[in-house]
UniProtKB/Swiss-Prot annotation:
One of its GO terms (biological process) is proteolysis. This is UPF0758 protein Rpic_2712. InterPro entries: MPN, RadC_JAB, RuvA_2-like, UPF0758, UPF0758_N. It comes from the Bacteria. SUPFAM superfamilies: RuvA domain 2-like. It comes from Ralstonia pickettii (strain 12J).
Length: 224
């Protein structure tokens, strides 16, 4: 049965307008994006098929064009629309991190990091540089590596902290494997950076490890 023939309160678009997007399932939200299904399948049926095929909404969003287009009814146009939508979300979150903003919500930082680093196929080490009142001065991606590691140079981080006249930093890097548990080398590096930056009177507030669906914070786990 086509969605247009469903009772109005069950149609995804009408349901969203009546109750807000949080009331919809992943499949219903995806169906609104898809707009139409394929012969024999409604947009909701197609959305469920996509989610079942990829395993989750996050994996669907991070699928390659070839993987995405392997599903009947999906192609370059839908792939482009999806990634345009994701980029809009990234940029909207990034606007929340304007110069001079005070960091008050750990969750907003995590959301930004997931959208910015969670999908990267290689490790990226980045840093928020903050002033004495913990307002944002700059966000920089400093080092890029392989699937399993990024070579990090404490001296370069110290140079950037001095360049920005930062009083504090939040460190972040991603684990492309999706496992956000810190490795022994992550713990050792964090200690080294804390010591090195302390000599410059720069405080390391946190170190966050970013996966596709989760962000691990050293601070909240008592490792700072």
């Amino acid at each position: 049965m086509a969605i247009v023939d469903w009772p109005a309160h069950e149609r995804p678009r009408e349901k969203l307008l009546a109750h807000g997007p949080a009331a919809l399932s992943d499949a219903e939200l995806l169906a609104i994006f898809l707009r139409v299904g394929v012969p024999g399948k409604s947009a909701v049926d197609l959305a469920r098929e996509l989610l079942a095929h990829f395993g989750s909404l996050a994996r669907l969003c991070h699928a390659s064009q070839q993987e995405f287009s392997s599903i009947n009814g999906m192609g370059p146009a839908k792939y482009a629309q999806l990634h345009a939508l994701l980029e809009v979300a990234r940029r909207a979150l990034k606007e929340d991190f304007t110069q001079g903003q005070t960091f008050e919500s750990a969750q907003s930082v995590k959301d930004f990091l997931r959208l910015t680093l969670g999908h990267r196929p290689h490790e990226v080490f980045a840093c928020f540089f903050l002033d004495v009142r913990h307002r944002l001065i700059a966000w920089e991606e400093l080092f890029r590596g392989t699937l399993t590691e990024a070579r990090v140079y404490p001296r370069e981080i110290a140079k950037r902290a001095l360049h920005h006249n930062a009083a504090a930093v939040i460190l972040a890097h991603n684990h492309p494997t999706g496992n956000t548990e810190p490795s022994e080398s992550d713990v050792i590096l964090t200690r080294e950076l804390c010591r090195a930056l302390a000599m410059l009177d720069v405080i390391v507030l946190d170190h966050m490890i970013v996966g596709r669906n989760h962000v691990y914070g050293f601070l909240e786990h008592g490792k700072m």
